[in-house]
């Protein structure tokens, strides 16, 4: 089920849980929400995999042009794209060498049809939620 509390808690509290997050639409500008969220999650011990059409490295990690180019397993695909781009992102997810566990659509990113399709494909879907805010909530911290 979309936004299932157990899925969110399992992702963000698990000691051995997901550690690799592909961030689709990650900006190299420190003032952008995608950069701030990715930098925070990196600080919390997650490996960030930037997926964006330009740049060579972001947050010290090599940039991939598409999800399908990533040669190693990814636990979470975190989407910072406008809702109309979600079906194309999901199509890219389906081309990945290793199926991720989660499709996370950030705050303001809502696409019910693509979310339902992602669930049918076997992904756990979190929609219209901020990864950083949810991390803070699950760990009992006030979001800054």
Describe the role of every protein-language-model region.
Residues 1-7, 57-72, 78-90:
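Glycine-rich, highly charged phosphate/nucleotide-binding loops
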Residues 1-54, 59:
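Hydrophobic, well-ordered beta-alpha structural blocks that scaffold small-molecule cofactor pockets
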Residues 20, 75-76, 102:
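Structural motif
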Residues 55, 107-110, 129-133:
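Short, acidic/turn-prone active-site loops that include or flank metal/cofactor-
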Residues 58-61, 75, 113-116, 134-141:
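Short, charged, surface-exposed secondary-structure boundary motifs
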Residues 96-118:
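ADP-ribose/adenylate-binding Rossmann-like module
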Residues 122-144:
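Active-site capping/gating segments
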